[in-house]
Amino acid sequence: MKAITLLGSTGSIGTQTLDIVAQYPDQFRIVGMAAGRNIELLSQQIRQFRPEIVAIADPNQLSDLKDAIADVDPQPQLLAGEAGVVEVAAYGDAESVVTGIVGCAGLLPTIAAIKAGKDIALANKETLIAGGPVVLPLVEKHGVKLLPADSEHSAIFQCLQGVPEGGLRRIILTASGGAFRDWPVEKLPEVTVADALKHPNWSMGKKITVDSATLMNKGLEVIEAHYLFGVDYDHIDIVIHPQSIIHSLIELQDTSVLAQLGWPDMRLPLLYSLSWPERIATDWEQLDLVKSGDLTFREPNHQKYPCMQLAYDVGRMGGAMPAVMNAANEQAVALFLEEKISFLDIPKVIETACDRYQSQNTLQPSLEDILAADQWARQEILTISQSQTPVVTASPQLSAI
């Protein structure tokens, strides 16, 4: 039985991971949990899964959590704040840590887990996007496994099983196209928050659903694929696949193409990240190709999705630039969800922040450099958004790449 620590237990990734644990109690057990602010759900999870150690990100809610589980016996060790989440991530009994925390907040806990010798089921893509230059050397140093738990990178990882070194030519990431896949570009100025949160295929959290609508999510996945699989940006492509049945593909040196297919269900990549290299039999709905119907593809519209090209440009720059773009995006999406900037302002303010940071980019950043870049970008987005016209004028360097 594998002992698991779950970071972000009350979020979308966390609840689906717990569905798996509940369905396969002879395979997995939860020893540690960390969550944000949802005390009601967290207390229910503690009662059901009986973790040994729990952290809540908001220290002000620790006493309320204690009261909510006062009758639980035995009591888990309770911690709070960022330091508490980091301690849970490194907790001794866990073999694998599922990183379901949204955004760059997952970076420090993931690093702590790696240093403690835990295998990582990576559902927090920002860990690699912002921290790749630091995280990858630590993974190698501590001899842990970094297993992708999101659908696209899990698909690539599965397709690569048995492919000899040097056999991979190209990665093809599939994208649903998000909420505005079928909207004309001319209609995008009318986008509301409610519109952006209507994903056609997947059930996800608000931030990642907006990222899907801007296609920044796919741009971030390009950078993640670069770090995970060591593939140059020139050999990572994106294609719109509206049905979300093919989760990604690889092309081999002989032009053979391998793909991983399945219904849009995050539990499958999560399960594989926990069971690898084994396959666990499930009773989940099997893919019916006749029922799924046509599988279609189209080229992304660069005018509709400017975030996609921005991510390629920033990825090629390397260093701390991906951390800046990632943090700028997180802050911009938060402002959009608060209706403080428009949907079309999201790529504009992000590119403005990236343009302003370029001259101070560090190509071999330390963890401190990455965290400083992250904080700089968040503040810069607030500054840009408070100006009257947060409109970008792309730098020659960004435009030329």
UniProtKB/Swiss-Prot annotation:
Necessary cofactors: Mg(2+); Mn(2+)
Annotated binding of Mn(2+), by residue: 150, 152, 221
Keyword Nucleus included in the entry's annotation: no
Entry annotated with the keyword Manganese: yes
Pathways involved: Isoprenoid biosynthesis; isopentenyl diphosphate biosynthesis via DXP pathway; isopentenyl diphosphate from 1-deoxy-D-xylulose 5-phosphate: step 1/6
One biological process term in Gene Ontology: isopentenyl diphosphate biosynthetic process, methylerythritol 4-phosphate pathway involved in terpenoid biosynthetic process
Reaction(s) catalysed by this chain's protein: 2-C-methyl-D-erythritol 4-phosphate + NADP(+) = 1-deoxy-D-xylulose 5-phosphate + NADPH + H(+)
InterPro entries: DXP_reductoisomerase (IPR003821), DXP_reductoisomerase_C (IPR013644), DXP_reductoisomerase_N (IPR013512), DXPR_C (IPR026877), DXPR_C_sf (IPR036169), NAD(P)-bd_dom_sf (IPR036291)
Keywords of this entry: Isoprene biosynthesis, Manganese, Metal-binding, NADP, Oxidoreductase
Annotated binding of 1-deoxy-D-xylulose 5-phosphate, by residue: 125, 151-152, 176, 199, 212, 217-218, 221
E.C. numbers: 1.1.1.267
Family matches, as NCBIfam families: Dxr (TIGR00243), PRK12464.1 (NF009114)
Task of the protein: Catalyzes the NADPH-dependent rearrangement and reduction of 1-deoxy-D-xylulose-5-phosphate (DXP) to 2-C-methyl-D-erythritol 4-phosphate (MEP).
The name this protein goes by in its record: 1-deoxy-D-xylulose 5-phosphate reductoisomerase
This protein's encoding gene: dxr
